[in-house]
């Protein structure tokens, strides 16, 4: 077995790369795109099922309309123009895959390219709204023992 591999490598035959085909809860991407909203909602978690059962308002539908327009106007093989939005609570659905969305984080619009792995998540999960804490040295008065630490 070990002596077979060097012969294959020496022959100059490139090893084919196999890519994992995406599936959401056992359903492949093509089937997700063809699925009706009712069937799609059954695959989502309970929190998102509840959100869909309470109905979609005008705002998320307007965003999807803008995304469709951006995809339609994009040249073949090019990425669509980014669509800016404040709708951080928008749930990512299969129709949005391939779009670029500028998600507002309270200060700027973070551009997020929608990938198949993001289905069923909120847009806010991909645009962090706070700056993570970088802990430095403790200041004076942080602990009782800090009274004995000389000031610089």
Curated annotation (Swiss-Prot):
Chief location category: cytoplasm
Family: Belongs to the universal ribosomal protein uS19 family.
HAMAP family in alphabetical order: Ribosomal_uS19
A biological process term (GO) from this entry: translation
One Pfam family here: Ribosomal_S19
Alphabetical list of InterPro entries matching this protein: Ribosomal_uS19 (IPR002222), Ribosomal_uS19_CS (IPR020934), Ribosomal_uS19_euk/arc (IPR005713), Ribosomal_uS19_SF (IPR023575)
Domain of life of the source: Eukaryota
Signal peptide (from-to): none
Keywords: Cytoplasm, Ribonucleoprotein, Ribosomal protein
One MF annotation (Gene Ontology) recorded for this entry: mRNA binding
Localisation per UniProt entry: Cytoplasm
One GO CC term on file: cytosolic small ribosomal subunit
Protein name per the record: Small ribosomal subunit protein uS19u
